[in-house]
Amino acid sequence: RAVLIRSDDQFVALQDRYMRARRAKADMFISIHADAAENHAASGSSVYVLSDKGASSQAARWLADKENAADLIGVGGTSVSLDDKDPNLSVTLLDLSQNAIKRMSEDAAGNVLQSLKDLGKAHKKQVEYANFVVLRSPDVPSMLIETGFITNADEERKLNSPEHRKRLAYAISQGVRAFFIEQPLPGTYYARSGNIAPAGVNAASGGVFP
C-alpha cells in the first residue's frame, strides 16, 4: 500500500517528509522529482541514496535531540528506544541501524535504476550519492528518483504524458518489488507469501498496472 506524503501542490518541509513516512511505519520512502539543467540536452533518469557525509551529520543531530532519542530506531520490525541507553550504546545502535538502512537503500535503488533503464535512458549509469535532507531517515530505506529533465523538450513532453507517467510508476514499482522479493522484511506481503515473485511484465510495454 502506497501512502502519499502530499496529495496536492502544497509545500511540505523536507524533514517532515521523511518523518511522515516514519510515522506511517513505511517500509520504504521514495521521493520522486523531475530534474532540470542549464544544458537543455541533458536527459535520462537518476536514482540517489544518502551519502556517508549526510548519514554522519544526521546521526549527530539525531543523538543530540532528546525528542529523537525517545523515539524508536530499528530495522525490519525490530525497534528499540535510545532514550534509556548508555550514550556509547546509543551511538552503536544508531550506527548499526544506519548501516543496515544504507545497504538496503543501495540495493533497492539499484533495482529501481535497472528497471528505469529498461524503460529508457539513464542519466547516470549507477546509483548516485547525495546529502539530500529527504533521505535522512535513520530507519527507513530511502531513495530519491529524478524521472527525467523538464528542461529537455522531449522529456518534458513525455513527463506531461499520463501514459509515460504510468510507465514510470510501473517501472519504479517493479524495482521496489524486486527488492522486497530478494529481501522480504518481516511483516511485509512478501514475507507472508513465502517470497513468491509475481509474473514479470516488461516496464517499457506499459503492462497491466496493479
List where the protein language model places each region.
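Active-site-proximal helix/loop segments of hydrolytic enzymes
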Residues: 1-210
